[in-house]
């Protein structure tokens, strides 16, 4: 079905290949999970299969590709659209129509298929993803998870034998992620050939089987290729060394020497686990607030109220996590905090002063903001110029500019990309560039909207280390996130938003131990916390805490 031989590819003006002598065969009905570090070539491989690289992006390509009997290097992209459908990371960048129904029929209409066939395929696709009852809705009325399911429905309506999905849950909350993964599971069940690039490996365990396939890409080359059972039982340490996420159940089992490695929590023999754990002590800190919000309401111009009677305090010199489902109001609240949006009612106090009475330029000199979508803040044509831009605006002298830019390039592993256009970077690389553009300005407060989207394990852990370092040096950090493992590792304080209202403010441990609150807010606790809680240790929220606790008690030798 898919045959790739000696494939190498260079992006325009790139010296190093993004794909390096790739060879693989994928057979009909296979489910293939593609793992790899940020910028390793995962997305590039998918783009090679449908002809986007050769015909839309350009660059240099060598080797042979065959997809359902077609060569994407020589075939037109529109011809490849009958063989393979692609669902991208950001549904907003893929959806083109105003109406749900129009979006699903758009592709088949362009192929001039009979009307009866188009209607039949569209109805079937919408029912398959659970959106048939919303077929007359505007796309703008859908949640983030629904938009991604719509993108999958549009791909299904093309009736291609292969569906490729490039991090389809990157921007989704835990419940939205589960909904999309359930759709992907159903794609497996009806016999579609599915290629999935994904970082959220914990949630994936609900849909993959031991005989499914994993391909690991490292620096553009295939590093590992085998069944799920083979990879997780024999190569878990290799995956860690490559800087990739392991499912927490696999990570715990590997560290404790449990074989064979289970794939699901319900497969762990809880009574057989050593129970000499201890709950880690957490220092109760008393913070003084740097930002206070009092009785804030906010509505957009269409009259829809997004934030309702918000009152909160952002602790100084802390890492505060803002969590909630897609559409709960997190991004809107963050934009209010920096004065880019104005509340209908209420106050935002920065250092005790109403932020709306202050000069916005002066406020933004002290507050750095990293957008959810990095592309929204890029304004130049090279990575170097992007990092330097804010320094130029602030009239920083040339020597100091050069030093700071050099430090940022090194800090975020972007040294070899100085002349790349920001829009040609991978999702993870774009995210790291967006961090660099803000940190180079040395803000007093750093606000980050979904900072770990598209990040591999190595970069996520580095970011956690960096945020802790910045906090210890006096920076106040606010992060909006859907990643509960990330929250567990670095947050001092957590605020939960649900439908524009605050449901909870306090210690992350209290949140993870409140099952009713988690379910109401469409959140979930880390898998390792579930294991520890069954053993009665409710303060253990990370794999490191779980395993080090056993080691300290000399249970593991």
Task: List each language-model region with its residue ranges.
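The feature captures the beta-strand-to-loop junction immediately N-terminal to the Walker
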Residues: 35-37, 323-325
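Helix-to-loop junction immediately C-terminal to a conserved catalytic motif
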Residues: 50, 338
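Conserved ABC transporter NBD signature motif
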Residues: 58-70, 346-354, 363
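Conserved ABC ATPase "signature" region
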Residues: 116-134, 399-417
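Conserved ABC ATPase signature
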Residues: 138-142, 146, 421-425
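Catalytic Walker B motif of ABC-type/P-loop ATPase nucleotide-binding domains
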Residues: 163-166, 446-449
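Conserved ABC ATPase "signature" C-loop
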Residues: 220, 499-500
């Amino acid at each position: 079905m898919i045959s790739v031989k000696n494939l190498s590819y260079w992006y325009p003006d790139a010296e190093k290949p993004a794909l390096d002598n790739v060879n693989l065969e994928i057979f009909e009905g296979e489910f293939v999970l593609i793992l790899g570090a940020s910028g390793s070539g995962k997305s590039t491989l998918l783009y090679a299969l449908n002809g986007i690289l050769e015909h839309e992006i350009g660059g240099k390509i060598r080797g042979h590709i065959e997809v359902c009997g077609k060569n994407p290097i020589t075939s037109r992209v529109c011809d490849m659209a009958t063989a393979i459908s692609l669902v991208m990371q950001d549904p907003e960048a893929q959806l083109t129509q105003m109406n749900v129904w129009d979006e699903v029929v758009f592709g088949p209409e362009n192929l001039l298929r009979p009307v009866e066939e188009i209607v039949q395929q569209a109805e079937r696709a919408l029912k398959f993803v659970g959106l048939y009852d919303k077929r007359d809705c505007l796309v703008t009325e859908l949640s983030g998870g629904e938009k991604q399911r719509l993108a999958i429905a549009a791909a299904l309506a093309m009736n291609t034998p292969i569906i490729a999905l490039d991090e389809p849950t990157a921007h989704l909350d835990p419940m939205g992620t589960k909904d999309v993964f359930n759709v992907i599971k159903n794609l497996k069940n009806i016999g579609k050939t599915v290629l999935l690039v994904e970082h959220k490996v914990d949630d994936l365990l609900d849909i993959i089987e031991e005989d499914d396939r994993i391909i690991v890409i490292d620096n553009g080359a295939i590093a590992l290729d085998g069944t799920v059972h083979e990879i997780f039982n024999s190569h878990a340490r290799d995956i860690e060394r490559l800087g990739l996420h392991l499912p927490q159940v696999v990570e715990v089992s590997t560290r404790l020497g449990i074989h064979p490695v289970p794939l699901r929590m319900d497969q762990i023999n809880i009574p057989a686990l050593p129970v000499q754990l201890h709950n880690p002590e957490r220092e109760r800190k008393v913070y003084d607030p740097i930002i206070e919000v009092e009785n804030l309401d906010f509505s957009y111009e269409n009259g829809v109220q997004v934030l309702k009677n918000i009152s909160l305090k952002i602790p100084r010199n802390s890492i505060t996590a803002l969590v909630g489902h897609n559409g709960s109001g997190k991004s809107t609240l963050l934009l209010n905090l920096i004065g880019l949006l104005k509340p209908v009612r209420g106050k935002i106090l920065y250092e005790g002063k109403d932020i709306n009475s202050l000069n916005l330029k002066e406020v933004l000199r002290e507050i750095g903001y990293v957008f959810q979508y990095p592309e929204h803040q890029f304004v130049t044509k090279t990575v170097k110029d992007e990092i330097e831009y804010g320094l130029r605006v602030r009239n920083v002298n040339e020597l100091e500019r050069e030093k700071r830019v050099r430090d940022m390039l090194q800090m975020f592993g972007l040294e070899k990309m100085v002349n790349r256009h920001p829009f040609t970077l991978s999702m993870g690389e774009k995210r790291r560039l967006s961090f660099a553009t803000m940190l180079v300005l040395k803000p007093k407060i750093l606000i980050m909207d979904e900072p770990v989207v598209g990040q591999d394990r190595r970069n996520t852990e580095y970011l956690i280390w960096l945020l802790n370092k910045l906090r210890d040096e006096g920076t106040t950090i606010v992060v909006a996130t859907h990643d509960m493992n990330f929250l567990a590792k670095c947050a001092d304080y957590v605020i939960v938003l649900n439908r524009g209202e605050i449901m909870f403010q306090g210690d992350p441990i209290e949140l993870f131990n409140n099952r009713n609150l988690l379910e109401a807010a469409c959140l979930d606790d880390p898998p390792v916390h579930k294991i520890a809680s069954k053993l009665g240790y409710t303060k253990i929220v990370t794999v490191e805490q779980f395993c080090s606790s056993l080691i300290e008690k000399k249970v593991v030798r």
